[in-house]
């Protein structure tokens, strides 16, 4: 008969070892009835021992796993290769090491501790003393904190005293008293006479009017009547109005304008036009003031003045003006009523209160240094000898920017001032008319070799159209026209002469529109042609300088290599035009 199958986690010693469902997994011969303790079926159908660390099987036998320091002796006993010796307070009993302790040391929960009683306590792993004021721990020593009058003297507590307290020979604290204090009765008392008395153990003062004791503050006060007051804790006479005190606290009469004290008499002090010999009266001169029949001060007035009735039923003297003649009132002052074309000058250097009338001007009109009206002239306009407006002025020509018609050596091609470069720019509305020519005066271009096949001149301008230092042309040779020379003062703006940035954009590569290409001739000889390329707002200059321009012009003359040897570089004049920036 089969037994009930145990749970899956227990060993079933009854054959067969099959599951509750399904056929037997392995054949079996006889059912070995064995204890499940220490046995297991692993793998299925095989009876084996159930072992755990440090037990193991080795060569079919049960064996013991051993770590470092353990071994088996010849008798098969487990031994340790490390022999431990100890010294007191440690002791060894068989395989155990223990610690001998005595009070106050003890072992609690396997740890060595110190048994303590108050005021000792273990805090944060350290033995300390609990203390309450006045006991304290200072410099790792228990001490007593003191505060005056208690102090420590010669390692003993002592009492500091000062008069009237003192220590007697019997080491007692006594009080030294002087009149009116007394200690005759063994207690501190006061000797007193009237008006001081004692009532219910309290000192009081016998008083009568005008003295009284204020009920709310128990302070002695003085009752004051009319004309008397207490001020800054002092009893004094109450004064008001013109009565006061002098520097010696004497009562006096204060006097103001028109009054003074002389020989302890109050005197009316007057000045002209008043007189006070016997009575106060007004002195009148020969002016318009007079005393009328009603004994009132009145005024005589003539033409240009009149009296008018004010809103408060008073009469006021006013100037009579004729508004139709250009006069008017400005608040309380007479003013000129300026019409169209006239105004008042507020920018006068004479005085900020002086505003002369002047002609009101608009665009195109100004004042000269003499204050006369003149016409404002823009660029290209001037006055001729007759004073008429004319176009152009050769002595101050703001329509021509040039090098002069015949400049000195002013340009660098290969070396400083090795070339005379002529360039004239004339503003013609939205166009600029230009003439250019170049002549070598020194260096290798004064006698060219066969290796030279081109000459380039670069002009670079900043955002204001001012020639930059990194140009081939020297700055001081380039300015507005003044006769056959240039202005002495450097110019600051010539944007109107610059190539238009929309028409000739500064791009990474030159475009066809940026270039003006034509044929010119060496020395003006038609048998010696050269190609002139004028580039407007080109970018080739950025490879030669770190300072980038806003506008630029470059002029390049080129010819076949090997030609014109020993010749001097000199070009004929070439005229061209371009669209202006402004």
Swiss-Prot record:
Sorted UniProt keywords: Capsid protein, Glycoprotein, Host nucleus, Host-virus interaction, Late protein, Phosphoprotein, Repeat, Viral attachment to host adhesion receptor, Viral attachment to host cell, Virion, Virus entry into host cell
Main subcellular localisation: virion
Protein name: Fiber protein
Species whose genome carries this gene: Human adenovirus C serotype 2 (HAdV-2)
UniProt-listed GO biological process terms: adhesion receptor-mediated virion attachment to host cell; cell adhesion; symbiont entry into host cell
Region (Spacer): 393-398
Positions carrying Phosphoserine: 325, 351
SUPFAM superfamilies (UniProt xref): Fibre shaft of virus attachment proteins, Virus attachment protein globular domain
Subunit field text: Homotrimer; arranged in a triple beta-spiral. Interacts with host receptor CXADR. Interacts (via N-terminal tail region) with pentons.
Region (Tail (penton base attachment)): 1-44
Pfam families: Adeno_knob (PF00541), Adeno_shaft (PF00608)
